[in-house]
UniProtKB/Swiss-Prot annotation:
Keywords per UniProt: Ribonucleoprotein, Ribosomal protein
Alphabetical list of HAMAP family matching this protein: Ribosomal_bL17
Protein name as annotated: Large ribosomal subunit protein bL17
Gene Ontology molecular function: any one: structural constituent of ribosome
UniProt similarity note: Belongs to the bacterial ribosomal protein bL17 family.
Database matches in PANTHER family: LARGE RIBOSOMAL SUBUNIT PROTEIN BL17M, RIBOSOMAL PROTEIN L17
InterPro entries: Ribosomal_bL17, Ribosomal_bL17_CS, Ribosomal_bL17_sf
PROSITE patterns, A to Z: RIBOSOMAL_L17
Cellular component terms (Gene Ontology): cytosolic large ribosomal subunit
Naturally occurring in which organism (per UniProt): Ehrlichia canis (strain Jake)
């Protein structure tokens, strides 16, 4: 039975696990779409959702405190600035559900289930077709 089991361990120490999730959070905020294994994507989702909510709460008021709080959590000023300046404006009218997990088959080497985790409502670069 899974009583009182909160998170996955990923066969890592707690410091390694937190560093991995922190790096994945920063990558997702910067690139807005990353590919990883399905369990890692499922574990990453609540961390990113909470960071975006913090950015939304402190966007209008207490901006300096909000930036300092995000920098203390994710240790990356560029990602914290993007959370406050870009993502909090984009998700101003959305109450949660900022990420999407798309299953992406299996990895060739070890058949691990892969997934793409991305931010919803992101800008997609379009390529024009010349009609050829």
């Amino acid at each position: 039975m899974r009583h009182r089991v909160a998170h996955r361990k990923f066969s890592r120490t707690s410091a390694h696990r937190m560093a991995m999730l922190l790096n994945m959070c920063i990558s997702l905020i910067k690139h807005e779409r990353i590919s990883t294994t399905l369990p890692k994507a499922k574990e990453l989702r609540p961390y990113v959702e909470k960071l975006i909510t913090i950015g939304k709460v402190y966007h209008g008021k207490n901006l300096v405190y909000g930036k300092r709080l995000l920098i203390s959590k994710i240790k990356n000023p560029d990602a914290a600035n993007k959370l406050i300046d870009v993502l909090s404006i984009r998700y101003k009218s959305r109450n949660g559900g900022y990420t999407r997990i798309i299953k992406n088959g299996f990895r060739k080497g070890d058949s691990a289930p892969m997934a793409i985790i991305e931010l919803v409502d992101r800008q997609i670069a379009t390529v024009e077709n010349n009609g050829s």
